Design a protein with these regions (language model features):
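Sec/Tat signal peptide C-region and signal peptidase I cleavage site
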Residues: 16-22
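Right-handed parallel beta-helix
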Residues: 23, 88, 134-146, 171-185, ...
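Acidic Gly/Asp/Thr-rich repetitive segments characteristic of extracellular carbohydrate-active
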Residues: 30-68, 77, 122
Length: 341
């Protein structure tokens, strides 16, 4: 009898533990009025779902435009919790992730919270902090971030108008894929800012498009900032078009007393423009830092800069390069050359 009771108790406790650890699946639709447990009972409040989501939870967001606040709070952002998977691009009837057809439905995360002028938009649309590789953002259009604050440091009012990935004093390396980042503006890193101050930011950015983003200074699309830390992102199968900045209109990499060793593969850099150097990519080493991009299988076409180099400026590792462009320190390629690696 005691053995039966013991076995029953173990089964009960095991089932209880499984129920406690079970992951939640939330559904978000603009017209939703439910608790978010199914498409039929979807909620319209994405911010509320993000606030209660825990590691292992999954969020599906249907087509439509979502803003981080309905008020005039420019500091509001969509904060993605560590370990949470957030997917957009749904019609609102899919049963499996594979039922989603990318491009069929547009799920937009927008910083347009005020009037039609951008100066009252939210500073940063999406924010990660200490996010592990299990954290996923997939299938969104991210637009309208406007980080025009005074340049006094690497904060959300000046950097990362589209996405701010903060690994300061920790590690933040989420997966960002199948996203379009367009028409974002900031002082630095308009589309994505990876900040590694005394920490690490090594996200994977895959199958994304960066279109018409603009920064006043560094990184029109992406700024990988290895400031006293480690910033080694993987960027693959992405396209960069029409982005603008002072330095590094497509991607700017900086190793300020730290390490910045990005791997950029199978990407296209087309018609990006920098005022000074690096129409496509600029590597900036400061202090005793290390900064070197590994490039493989990329295409550079019609990128330009007023003073310096149109495509890639500074030291890089080139793999599978064409014979007429040998790998060497200080590789400089003019935008008149459409070069494929």
């Amino acid at each position: 009898m005691k053995q039966i009771l013991l076995t029953t108790m173990m089964v009960f406790l095991g089932g209880l533990a499984m129920s406690v650890q079970a992951n939640n699946h939330y559904f978000v639709q603009l017209e939703g009025e439910g608790d978010g447990t199914s498409w039929k009972d979807a909620t319209s409040n994405l911010q509320e779902v993000l606030a209660k989501a825990k590691a292992g939870d999954v969020i599906w967001v249907a087509n439509g435009t979502y803003t981080p606040t309905n008020e005039a709070d420019r500091t509001a952002s969509f904060i993605i919790p560590d370990g949470v998977q957030v997917y957009g691009g749904f019609i609102g009837e899919e049963k499996k992730l594979t039922d989603r057809v990318l491009g069929e439905a547009k799920t937009i995360l927008s910083g347009e919270i005020g009037t039609e002028v951008p100066e009252d938009n939210t500073y940063t649309v999406v924010y990660f902090q200490n996010a592990s590789a299990a954290t996923i953002l997939d299938g969104f259009i991210i637009t309208g971030g406007y980080a025009d604050g005074l340049v006094e440091g690497a904060d959300l009012t000046t950097c990362g108008a589209g996405i701010y990935n903060n690994g300061e004093y920790g590690v933040s390396s989420p997966l960002i894929q199948n996203c379009i980042l367009m028409n974002n503006f900031s002082r630095e890193g308009a589309a994505i800012y990876n900040y590694a101050n005394d920490g690490e930011t090594s996200p994977t950015i895959s199958d994304c498009q960066f279109v018409y983003n603009r920064s006043d200074f560094n990184g029109g699309a992406i700024f990988n900032d290895g400031n006293f830390g480690t910033c080694n992102p993987t960027i693959k199968n992405c396209s960069f078009k029409g982005n603008e900045s002072m330095y590094g209109a497509g991607v700017l990499n900086r190793g300020l007393y730290g390490e910045c060793l990005p791997v950029i593969t199978d990407c296209a850099f087309i018609d990006n423009f920098s005022v000074v150097r690096g129409g496509a990519i600029y590597n900036q080493r400061e202090g005793r830092g290390v900064c070197e991009a590994q490039l493989e299988g990329n295409i550079f076409e019609d990128n330009g800069s007023t003073i310096g180099d149109g495509d890639v400026d500074q030291t890089n590792k080139f793999l599978n390069e064409s014979p007429d462009q040998p790998s060497k320190a200080g590789v400089r390629m003019r935008s008149a050359e459409a070069i494929s690696y």
